[in-house]
Amino acid sequence: MKRIVQIFDAQNFSAEALAFSASIVRHSGSSLIGLFVQDTSFINDPGMNIIAGQFYVEEIVLTSEEKQKIQDTTDASVAAFMQACEQHNITGIAIVKQGIPAEILKTESRYCDMMIVSPLLSFDGEQAVPTVFVYNLLAAAECPVLLSPERFQNIDEVIIAFDGSKSASFAIRQFAYM
C-alpha cells in the first residue's frame, strides 16, 4: 500500500482539492491520509514591543475560548474530509498535527510516498499562487509533491519540475513507481 498524504490547513479545509486526490488514490489502489496542520508558531513566539520608550517582551497566550474555537474548526475540517472521502468512495484517514507547518511537513515527507498540496496553501494569509510556503515545501520535501488544481476534471498531463538536485531525482523516481 502506498502512503499518499494530502496536506490541509486545519483552519481552512478545501473540499475541491479532494476530488483530484480521490482520482490519484483510486488509480493507485491505496487510501488517502489527510494531514491537518495547526499552525502554533504564532502562539509560542514572544515578541519585543515598546511602550513609552520602554521595551518589554509580549507572549501571545490564547484564552480557553480561542483554543476551543480553533479545536471546533479543526474538528469540522476533519469531519468534512471524512464525509468527502465517503462521497468519493475512498478510504480516508485523518491526522491532526500541531506545530510549525514547515517542520511538520518536512518530517512527514520522509515517511510518505507522495504528498498532494494545494498551490494556495498558506498559513499566513498569502494570496500568491503558488505561495512562498508551497515553494519552500517543494524545495524541502523528501518525496514527490503534486500540486492539486483548483478545479479538477481529469488528468491530461503531468509536468515535472527538475532543478538538478539529488532530492528532485529521487522524487521523480519515486513518482515513476507510483
Language model feature labels by segment:
Residues 3, 14-20, 25-26, 94, ...:
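Gly/Ser-rich helix-loop-strand patches that form or flank binding pockets
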Residues 1-60, 140-143, 153-178:
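Small/aliphatic-rich secondary-structure junction motif
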Residues 78, 102, 131, 169-172:
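Short, well-ordered alpha-helical scaffold segments within catalytic/effector domains
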Residues 39-42, 65-68, 72-115:
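Structural beta-alpha unit
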Residues 9, 69, 93, 121-125, ...:
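Conserved short-loop catalytic and cofactor-binding motifs
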Residues 46-52, 66-76, 111-119, 141-147, ...:
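Short low-complexity stretches enriched in small and charged residues
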